[in-house]
Amino acid sequence: MPYQCPITFNDEQLEICELKNQLEIFTQYQKSEFLNHHPVTDLVLLRSEYMDLLLNRLWEHFGFSKLPHIALVAVGGYGRGELHPLSDIDILIVSQRTLPSALGEKVSQFITLLWDLKLEVGHAVRTIAECIEIGSDDLTVATNLQESRLLCGSEDTFQELKLKIHSDSFWPSETFYKAKIQEQRERHARYHDTTYNLEPDIKSTPGGLRDIHTLSWVARRHFGATSLLEMSKYGFLTDAEYRELVECQDFLWRVRFALHIELRRYDNRLTFAHQAQVAEHLGYTGEGNRGVEMMMKEFYRTLRRVAELNKMLLKLFDQAIINGGQTQEAEILDNDFQRRGSLIEARKPALFQARPETILDMFIHIANDSTIEGVSPPTLRQLRTARRRLNRFLHTIPEARDKFMDLVRHPNALHKAFSLMHKLGVLSAYLPQWSQIVGQMQFDLFHVYTVDEHSIRLLKHINRFSQVENHDKHPICCEVYPRVQKKELLILAAIFHDIGKGRGGDHSEIGAVEAYSFCIEHGLSKPEAKQVAWLVQNHLLMSVTAQRRDIYDPDVITEFAKKVRDEESLELLVCLTVADICATNPELWNSWKRTLLAELFHSTQRALRRGLENPVDVRDRIRHNQQMASALLRKEGFSAREIEVLWQRFKADYFLRHTHTQIAWHCEHLLRLEDPSQPLVLISKKATRGGTEVFVYCKDQAALFATVVAELDRRNFNVHDAQVMVSKDGHVLDTFIVLDQHGEAIDEARHKAVAKHLTHVLADGRPTKIKTRRTPRNLQHFKVKTRVEFLPTKSKKRTLMELRALDTPGLLAQVGATFAELDINLHGAKITTIGERAEDLFILTSDAGGRLSEEQEQALRERLTEHVSELAP
């Protein structure tokens, strides 16, 4: 039987235990009704009505209803009659004069009872004069008072308060408006001025409920409008805008209500810990994370709609009401457009509906003139109307296609025009595929932006390659990009590179097919269309090769160069790759990745210039490194004989996989070593391959790799590359490239302590027990299936193994310990972290020195899967 709200509470029900029970029954009833798809608007209003009943009865129970000059008033969200399960219940006890101490004590007992009931009560006890005095200096208090609603008590007292609140002297409309605009700016800044946050605050994020409240507050202060419906009656909203705001508010309320029934304490953050459950409550389902991604897509789209309406309506209010309709003189640009101040506007009220292709003309003007900062509010309203009434996508209009390509080829379009086209929904109106990626997120820590936002940021990063001030950060791209003759090919590849996401299948293949069709439709030649399609299809190739393959292996370079084909493709690909990494996550780009990509770029460039039929001779490379290193060592006073004796202990691989400067640095310290039986640990002062090099020399011992990486992990250092070698006389020559937790080289002040501790551990000779740090909170809500794959390789002597797993603390040490447990030799490792996932490559041999057998591979797969799963939170 459905729970019924009581009309009254009798005296027996006013016992605290009974009240708690009644509240719990009501809360469970609301949860059940919500999960049975009862309209959230009804539930939000019903909760407010229920609290009204409870507070009225308690007010009467305490005897306050007999007092003539005191009133109980709901303020804030409760004043609006909007309560979610964990919403604060904000009340004001207002009187005409200061309460006597005995009455004040009784009021305190009333508030204490509400707290004892576990209600989230925010309260104030003030006289009317105090309300006005405090509210005059405090915008939040003033805003809450605007939404005050009498619950019970003195009507005269409440009306006197309302009269003073609505007087012109208390926060005049213009003053209130400007203060709320500044408050909103500051709030948006706290969320980086974007609607796209991984764990968004439903209430406060740009485009969230607070943006709707801001519109309501401004309209209430100026017009006296108490609801969205009244705002439309005053002409502040059109009927269509009113319906859209109601629709957006309803969706955000449903998300918030679903979140609140999952929480025990008040919070409006849609964290990773609760996104899946909220999605399930709202009926979003699918394989894996599909349900979450579908919900968040609608969530982000809703935020975009609210943010757009908020910005437009506040500007219209400013222009029409605050400035009294006065505007700057217009400067005519052409027959269709003019500029007024820093804003562009259409000269005809139905321009976009009559000739939709002129929408693109507006953005060509914006690209032509850097002083145009945006679109005027009336034109924005016209654009929104035209956008909704389009009966076909803009790309189907031949004139629009020409104008779009003019923008793609425009040297200034990347700076502002494309981001504005996206923000104002024009890219979605132009290209159906783009409309599908708007709000498309991925439930992980790697992609911090939605697909559409990421793609726009990618375009902006490409634009930065033309700016001299970015040369130090992106030396190759800043050198290459200015000489790219057909930049439009790169820009189109950027637009399409992720456009296939969210549709199942390989997004690179989907995007390549659609990019080719788009290019042909827009008048590009077949070779140009093929180049764009190739870039889209292979936009991950360079990043994957650099970070997850052994780029010091000549065969890897040759294979990569064959796929790239020519220098023009290489130059386009490196620009796309770097921009893609930078636009995926601000924390991804560091000196390590820059160095890896630079080495791959230059090695491939040399291979292409030399000709793929003329691969580099490994012996020549070894000889070159030895000659250069020997010259450096002789400058330090070492004889050729000393150098030769030392080098006779090393295998050829050592000279192939280190630079001549690394070799000279290692050998200088080895030649100065007083006791060769003691471990040597070196830490580079200068960055090596974009990180700090840790060189370890000691007698080979069990689980040495696991020991070293475990010690580094304890100090919050991340190993990104490892070269593991054993000399002919059984000494290890291991090199680790390490970064700190911020992706930077290790602070030199820590070098001495780290080297000393590692030396002590290695001298002890016993394997270090793997002690894992606590798994970070943001990793605890992700599940990554452990996968062990053995990759095809031309080598008959070595096995390549790729591990994919949750990037838990101690993972690498556990992997190393497993190798030692199974008598498997490790020769190299490439460590890649992609958000919450580790994707690591290991070069292995059996204890006998050859490739692993199928039986050994299977045993390793099973043991690794078992051990890694034990690390999961």
From Swiss-Prot:
Residues 1-332 are annotated as: Uridylyltransferase. Pfam families: ACT (PF01842), GlnD_UR_UTase (PF08335), HD (PF01966), NTP_transf_2 (PF01909). Keywords: Hydrolase, Magnesium, Multifunctional enzyme, Nucleotidyltransferase, Repeat, Transferase. Its cofactor is Mg(2+). GO terms for molecular function: [protein-PII] uridylyltransferase activity; phosphoric diester hydrolase activity. One of its GO terms (biological process) is regulation of nitrogen utilization. Residues 451-573 form the HD domain. Uridylyltransferase (UTase) activity is inhibited by glutamine, while glutamine activates uridylyl-removing (UR) activity. SUPFAM superfamilies: ACT-like, HD-domain/PDEase-like, Nucleotidyltransferase, Nucleotidyltransferase substrate binding subunit/domain. Belongs to the GlnD family. Has four distinct domains: an N-terminal nucleotidyltransferase (NT) domain responsible for UTase activity, a central HD domain that encodes UR activity, and two C-terminal ACT domains that seem to have a role in glutamine sensing. This is Bifunctional uridylyltransferase/uridylyl-removing enzyme. It comes from Vibrio atlanticus (strain LGP32) (Vibrio splendidus (strain Mel32)). The lineage of its organism: Bacteria, Pseudomonadati, Pseudomonadota, Gammaproteobacteria, Vibrionales.
